């Protein structure tokens, strides 16, 4: 089990450091594969409920050691109950190699409006040939099922009137928690993810209203996290210790190296961007000996930019937005990045970059109320005028 670097648990303080510069490509080296494996949790057995849905057996807990080697297994995991007593079922694909090896888990659908992440995982699993593999790859595709059914970021609950909960603030959850989403997280983490995982990749996209390019979020102080992230040909990495409640942070707390790829915009498939993440994921499998083959393009080939902070530019007025920069554009302090007009067409606000950095997110809606994130910048220097860290 790796020794995790000490982390200040305050969410805001995690994002305060703004001191990193883009690393010279010659200085970016792959971390060596971690020696040893995370502490093994108590073994759980596979429990079949006896139900079959669309030809797939249903499990309430899974141990991939129980599955036949050299094959793909399609299952449903029985999650938390709905208000009518039926369960939410989560789609699980296990590619069980013919030989033992690393166990790598891919997740998507923690936010319900993030479609390219799901497509990326589906594509990866479709390319695997278990008979040629050493180890196991498990994909869990639609974790926040009710959010996905309504194509929205947050989990809808009706226990205290209608409310929306961000599932990616609930991990590792609690099987006996005070909300359905907390219980779903607890069931999935304790009975499916943690017992079957040595390395984990939690795929996301931007959210409705905020577009992002291809980039990663992860803590590069952890050797296996650094190694995995640099195996993707992505143009940017946010080197960031995750705060509590996020799935990849829950993995790390459990001794399992993990990070989050961000696969473009929400709500639609970006078929130009997903191949970047498919290629990188295959590189991870090859690096860790799960599948044979030569490693393809990596972060070095993409001239990767690494930032330590994400600094937002917030709207100060309501009105119509006119963006003056694009995703992945380099910006400098004082550079005008957007302006805002009222209904008469009069300019009511102009916005400038507080830092040197790379544009990592842009508001996609053409209007905004005051206080919304207009854009955020992956920063390589301390912000001017006390600019606040990105609140996500």
Role assignments for model-derived ranges:
Residues 1-9, 16-27:
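N-terminal secretory signal peptides
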Residues 2, 9-15, 32-392:
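Structured catalytic-domain cores with a bias toward divalent-metal coordination
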